[in-house]
A protein has these predicted regions:
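Short secondary-structure transition/capping segments
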Residues: 69-72, 95-98
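Residue-level detector of anion-binding/catalytic polar loops
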Residues: 55, 81, 105
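Glycine-rich phosphate/adenosyl-contacting loop at the front of the ribokinase-like
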Residues: 1-61, 66-70, 76-77
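A glycine-rich helix N-cap at a beta->alpha junction
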Residues: 74-91
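Conserved phosphate-binding/catalytic loop of the ribokinase/pfkB sugar-kinase fold
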Residues: 87-88, 98-109
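Short, well-ordered, mixed-charge alpha-helical segments that flank or form enzyme active sites
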Residues: 15, 94, 106-108
């Protein structure tokens, strides 16, 4: 019998771009290797436990928006139970802008 794992946490879409250096206010840099993908510590754990064969439940809140659709598509594809996932029009789904420099250092907004 598969274990039941319930994860309470967040979902956010990560928008990642590489630049030679971290920009300062007012500066424009050319970036490369843009990527967009699902994330959030709780969400990542729920997906990982489902991939390992657990009955995985995710408890969280997402917006009724395009980024929220990324979450629900992900959970359906990965077999994460969303019985306790709630959606709202009162806030947007989380997003993080991740900037990586040539040294591998990053910051997230």
């Amino acid at each position: 019998m598969a274990p039941i794992i319930t994860v309470v946490g967040s979902f956010a879409v990560g928008l990642t771009i590489r630049t030679p250096q971290v920009p300062i206010f007012g500066q424009t840099l050319i970036g490369s290797d843009f990527d967009m993908g699902p994330g959030g510590k709780g969400s990542n754990q729920a997906v990982a436990t489902a991939r390992l064969g657990a009955n995985s439940y995710f408890v969280g809140l997402i917006g009724e928006d395009k980024l929220g659709e990324i979450a629900t598509d992900l959970y359906q594809r990965e077999g994460v139970d969303t019985s306790y996932l709630r959606t709202t029009t009162q806030m947007a789904t989380g997003a993080g802008l991740i900037i990586l420099n040539s040294k591998g250092e990053n910051f997230i907004i």
